[in-house]
Regions:
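Intrinsic disorder/low-complexity segments
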Residues: 1-2, 56, 68, 121-160
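Solvent-exposed, charged helical/coil patches
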Residues: 1-42, 113, 119-124, 129, ...
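Conserved catalytic cores of phosphodiester-cleaving nucleases, focusing on short active-site segments
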Residues: 22, 45, 67-83, 94
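Nucleic-acid nuclease catalytic cores
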Residues: 78-127, 133, 147
């Protein structure tokens, strides 16, 4: 599945959750509901996949993205009235640290669902990607990280 179709499906799942619940719940509630919708859509995902962050070759800690969908898209969820630059920076860092082609920052906290698409300019195929009409943000922060394989369950219905 190409990235355009994949992000379209993910956003559709998020819209269904937001249309059903509305705003006002804690982020973890939206995360659990989105996991249900991703499974129903037949999308493979890992939840809260951990990565080790290195600084100058030294392990300095770990980070966890809310979802890695189909091993290609980082999905970071928020449940805030307004997104701020710090949330966008966090999503940018995840896209680069996890070495994925793109990420989605999805906010369930406002009356209308908000999402931003974030491309990783360091990912080789992104040089040819086009903006699909969703807010395109280029991640450009230098970051060094290595992946730790997640032991979280991946959707067994996935064709991967």
């Amino acid at each position: 599945m190409d990235l355009n179709n994949l992000t379209y499906k993910i956003n559709g799942c998020a819209m269904k959750v937001h249309n059903t619940l509305g705003n006002g719940f804690q982020e973890v509630i939206y995360q659990r509901c989105l996991a249900i919708e991703l499974e129903r859509a037949g999308l493979g995902y890992a939840r809260e996949q951990e990565h080790i962050i290195y600084y100058d070759g030294i392990d300095v800690g770990t980070r966890r993205a809310d979802f890695v969908v189909e091993e290609a898209v980082i999905v970071e969820l928020k449940a805030l009235i307004n997104l701020e630059d710090v949330h966008l920076a966090q999503a940018k860092n995840y896209v680069i640290a996890y070495d994925k082609p793109l990420g989605l920052l999805i906010n369930f906290g406002s009356t209308s669902l908000q999402f931003k698409k974030i491309y990783n300019p360091k990912y080789r195929q992104n040089q040819d990607l086009q903006d699909f009409g969703i807010n395109k943000i280029n991640a450009n922060k230098d970051s060094i990280s290595k992946s730790n394989k997640s032991h979280n369950p991946v959707n067994p219905d996935s064709d991967k």
